[in-house]
Amino acid sequence: MPTFNDLYYADMGNSQLRPEYTTQYNIGFAYDSRRSRGFLTEWSLHADAYRNFVRDKIVAYPKGAQFRWTMLNLGRVRITGIDLTGSLTLNPLRDLYITGKLQYTYQEAIDVTNPADTYYRDQIPYIPWHSGSAIVQATWRSWSLNYSFIYTGERYNQQENIVYNHTQPWYTSDISIARSFRWSRYSAKVQLEVNNLFSQDYDVILNYPMPKRNYRLTLSFEL
């Protein structure tokens, strides 16, 4: 069902939206292993493949000069995809744990509403075929260090998959370091983040450039 914002949010809502109807098929696999001792303490592998048929799919779509968006229904969309996730945790030294996680998604989401349309069987706007992430985290006692890499592949910013509408892939790296503290029954955490570590120029949405390298310091308390 469309949300209240989808229907009525100023300049973006569309009160004529219809609810989505979806037929879904999927098959999955999951394996998890844990050990109380040893160098490799935990690892897992998850896979999921799916095929969805969606009628009246609700999407956000740019209008005008793309500085304003609206919600609309796409008649029929066929989605085929696979999600893969793997992780492992190593314990090379006492109190030191290193965790790595990989995630990959392939998704084909094509408009199959009307064979007469110029965008028939084209990928719908802003849905990449390929995306993924990699995360490495090291923890030692009250310290933690985290690195993450996010990748989003090529997409199209309009319904027609033509060169003019092509949007370049983008990727970014983030890093953070944190320290936890305890006093009696109270706890605190201080964390420093460096986002977009290599100061990449990229747009998640056309004409909306994302910040270059930026920093955030967070201090939190639990009572």
Q: Where are the predicted features?
A:
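Short sequence motifs at beta-strands and strand-loop junctions characteristic
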Residues: L17-T23, F39, L74-T80, I124-W129, ...
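Outer-membrane beta-barrel proteins
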Residues: F29-R37, L45, G86-P92, W140-S142, ...
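Extracellular loop and loop/strand-boundary signature of outer-membrane beta-barrel proteins
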Residues: Y9-L17, F67-L74, A116-D122, Q159-N165, ...
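Outer-membrane beta-barrel translocator/channel fold
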Residues: M1-T23, D32, S36-G38, N52-K57, ...
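Hydrophobic, lipid-facing positions within transmembrane beta-strands of outer-membrane proteins
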Residues: G13-S15, T23-I27, L45, T70, ...
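Membrane-embedded beta-barrel scaffold of Gram-negative outer-membrane proteins
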Residues: E20-T80, S87
